[in-house]
A protein has these predicted regions:
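SAM-dependent nucleic-acid methyltransferase catalytic core
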Residues: 2-20, 30, 75-187, 191-200, ...
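SAM cofactor-binding core of SAM-dependent methyltransferases
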Residues: 26, 31-97
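Short, solvent-exposed coil/turn elements at secondary-structure transition points
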Residues: 41, 173, 249-251
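Short loop/helix-cap segments at secondary-structure boundaries that form the rim of catalytic
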Residues: 46-51, 178-181, 234-242
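Structural beta-sheet core signal
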Residues: 57, 188, 226-228
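Long, positively charged, glycine-interspersed low-complexity recognition regions
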Residues: 204-280
Length: 280
């Protein structure tokens, strides 16, 4: 595993796969030419993939697509505004007001998602402002230093989204239908099935059981290849029963105050040798 220090991330996001990237990439297929991140979220999967392919980050949440477009087109202006933004509960609360200015709306979204607990401020105000209280590091308050460091690292994110990277705002069915061809690879990280989690309304656009069935039906008809992430549960095992299934290592989960295990389902066979140590 290459570790996470060399990877880029714009913001934390509920269900994000930043700590799982090496495991996911190890089971990506070979010889695809278009990576489609169908439920993009923070887009860490497509942002960090190094293969020479077209990369499409699709996300239906307009706050997220606006943020990435503004970062791409107005990088210096947005980062300067964020560096001038205080780590403040008052600021956090005020950033829930919608702005007609795209740059200001991108700044407000970033404040919400980065100054909240576990990135849940992307759309849930009741998750609250993440105040620094006890934890310190060499730069002072850990929460504060993370805020400042994350803003400075946005330059690297901006560079990444200018390289073979396109942003779309389709619903998942339209995204798949629009791009599907033999060399397309769809990475799908839909909202976790409610059968596999205790909390609800964690996403701006939740997924019902019918949505999961609809996605699986569509993926079973595609010309390309697909990988689906989720937690182990009866629903996912039923709708992907004919797919290859791999259990990833158990990891600590701060939101759940326990441990979780991600599962991936694939409609293709293992195509790599010694896949956990493959360079990609």
């Amino acid at each position: 595993m290459s570790g996470n220090k060399s990877k880029v991330i714009a913001f934390n996001y509920f269900g994000g796969k930043f700590t799982w990237l090496d495991y996911l990439y190890a089971d990506f297929p070979v010889n695809f030419t278009h990576l489609v991140d169908v439920f993009g979220g923070s887009s860490v999967v497509s942002l960090n993939y190094k293969g020479n392919v077209i990369k499409t980050a699709n996300e239906i949440n307009s706050d997220i697509t606006n943020f990435f477009q503004v970062l791409r087109d107005n990088e210096d202006q947005l980062i300067r505004l964020l560096l001038l933004t205080p780590f403040s509960k008052k600021e956090y609360n005020e950033c829930w007001e919608v702005s007609d200015d795209k740059v200001e709306q991108a700044r407000r979204f970033y404040v919400r998602v980065r100054q909240s607990f576990f990135g849940l401020g992307a759309h849930r105000k009741n998750k609250g402002w993440h105040m620094a209280k006890m934890h310190v590091n060499c730069q002072g308050g850990e929460t504060l230093s993370r805020w400042n460091n994350a803003i400075r690292k946005l330059h690297a994110v901006a560079d990444a989204i200018r390289l073979n990277f396109q942003i779309t705002e389709f619903d998942y069915l339209q995204c798949i239908d629009t791009i599907d061809f033999e060399n397309a690879f769809f990475y799908c990280d839909p909202p976790y099935s409610r059968l596999s989690r205790k909390s609800y309304n964690d996403y701006k656009f939740e997924f019902t059981d019918d949505d999961h069935y609809e996605l699986a039906t569509k993926l079973n008809q595609i010309k390309g290849k697909a990988m689906v992430s989720g937690y182990d549960c009866s629903l996912m095992n039923e709708i992907y029963k004919n797919w290859r299934k791999i259990k990833l290592p158990v990891k600590k989960n701060n939101i759940r105050s326990g441990k979780v295990q991600e599962i991936i389902w694939m409609n293709y066979e293992n195509e790599r040798e010694n896949n956990l140590f493959t360079n990609y």
